[in-house]
A protein has these predicted regions:
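C-terminal helical cap and adjacent loop that interface with cofactors, partners, or active-site loops
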Residues: 147, 215-223, 230-233, 240-403
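Hydrophobic, small-residue-rich alpha-helical packing segments that form membrane-like cores
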Residues: 36, 50-54, 77
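Predominantly a Rossmann-like dinucleotide-binding segment in NAD(P)-dependent oxidoreductases
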Residues: 65-68, 75-186
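ADP-ribose/adenylate-binding Rossmann-like module
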Residues: 39-51
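Active-site beta-strand termini and strand-to-loop segments that position acidic
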Residues: 194-200, 224
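N-terminal glycine-/serine-/threonine-rich beta1-alpha1-beta2 phosphate-ribose binding loop
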Residues: 1-40, 56, 60-68, 375-403
Length: 403
């Protein structure tokens, strides 16, 4: 399969259950729509939808077909995020009232590597998208992990957002560098900040900056009534000795107040106490296999695990909608004097029915059965593939002999 429309033939195949979509942003939606229309689950790279029309189309199609539509947000599966989520779920931080996330990653060394649509396309698809669209166009790496901590559409929901940006300084220069022409309009500001207030009176702050020099940073900061977590630039936790003891962890001294980060020994003890079950199951293998430090492996493993065991996926189509909507809604806010914008309830009134975000797990006996069936199926596929390649090699050898 090849070419811009090859995916349509793939989606028609009866032997495929899920279509894994890792294209440029413009093709995420049409491929996902084609997949679900043809009875396939859709797993879509980030961001899965770029505007409200695409978001509602995916929701409607997923609900109509009863098929999974998941956004492949790998940053929800990094080790610090998984362990911190587990701590928050166990109440270590109290109520998390303010959470920050970001995508701060200067892309100037990479703009030239994004594919170009023909000889007249000098910018490449990603720089061109930033030139044409305002708002946080890549919010999900920062928003996804903190939305899980705040139980979004599982007891709380995003209610109102306000977005503000700088004007384009470096973005404009990058466009001029690659196009060789003056750039009068570059819509995306060098830095965009979005504030979101939830129904339960909590606040999320999301930052997007791919234009100015700075170390890679997804922020991931949780401010709770009893504790604090911070990933960038240095991983750390701040909790009191009293709360550590109540959690069953012996502090190095009784003077810990939460005013400073825990020392290495205390942090290690805390992480050992609250290591996520997912990290325990996949962590060692993830580090060995790699893929953004192992989080890609964990994400794909959880996706397959949930599908094999008939469980709800870790991220659903409503997560996709909430995490992607900042692009257009933020643009609306900024284009109208940085005014507050209401965030739709993508669940259509069901945001408070599930109490708390949770990962789903199968019973041990069911998990073992599903794993055995999967291994047997994989063995059959490998045998079939080996037979095919043996025949192909034999044919190639025979053809070579005739020459």
């Amino acid at each position: 399969y090849y070419g811009e429309n090859g995916y349509k033939e793939i989606c028609k195949r009866p032997d495929i259950d899920l279509v894994y979509i890792a294209t440029d942003w413009a093709h995420h939606f049409p491929v996902a729509k084609e997949a679900m229309t043809n009875g396939k689950h859709a797993a879509i790279e980030v961001p899965s939808a770029m505007n409200m029309h695409e978001i509602w189309e995916l929701i409607n199609l997923s609900e109509k077909t009863r098929l999974h539509c998941i956004m492949l947000e790998n940053c929800c599966y990094d080790f610090f995020e998984l362990n911190s989520l587990h701590m928050a779920q166990e109440g270590l931080f109290g109520d998390v009232i303010y959470a920050q996330g970001a995508y701060r990653h200067e892309l100037s060394p990479f703009w030239k590597h994004y594919w170009k649509n023909g000889p007249n396309d000098k910018l490449g698809w990603r720089l061109r998208y930033n030139k044409e669209f305002r708002g946080d166009v890549y919010a999900t790496h920062g928003l996804g992990p903190i939305a899980q901590v705040l139980n979004i559409h599982r007891g709380d929901r995003m209610r109102t957002l306000i977005a503000m940006d700088t004007r384009s300084f470096n973005g404009k220069k990058q466009a001029e560098k690659y196009s060789g022409e003056p750039c009068d309009t570059f819509r995306n500001g060098d830095q965009t900040t979005t504030l979101i207030r939830t129904e339960q009176g909590k606040v999320m702050e999301i930052i997007h900056n791919v234009m100015t020099p700075q170390p890679y940073n997804r922020m991931y900061q949780l401010t709770g009534t009893k504790g604090f977590a911070n990933k960038y630039p240095v991983e750390g936790y701040a909790v009191s000795a009293k709360d550590m003891k109540e959690a069953g962890v012996t502090p190095s001294n009784d003077d810990l107040s939460g005013h400073d980060y825990l020392k290495e020994a205390d942090m290690k003890a805390l992480v050992e106490r609250y290591t996520s079950p997912i990290v325990k199951k996949y962590g060692d293998e993830a580090k060995e296999v790699g893929g953004h430090g192992g989080m890609d492996f964990i994400m794909d493993s959880r996706l397959v695990y949930c599908l094999q065991n008939g469980l709800p996926l870790d991220m659903d189509v409503y997560d996709l909608a909430e995490w992607c909507c900042l692009a257009e809604l933020g643009s609306i806010s900024m284009d109208n004097g940085f005014m507050p914008v209401e965030v739709p309830d993508f669940t259509r009134g069901h945001w408070n029915e599930v109490k708390g975000y949770k990962h789903a797990y199968a019973a041990p006996e069911d998990e073992a059965k599903a794993l055995a069936e999967a291994k047997a199926f994989t063995a059959q596929l490998k045998a079939k593939g080996a037979k095919y390649w043996a025949a192909a090699d034999k044919k190639a050898t025979k053809k070579k002999g005739k020459k």
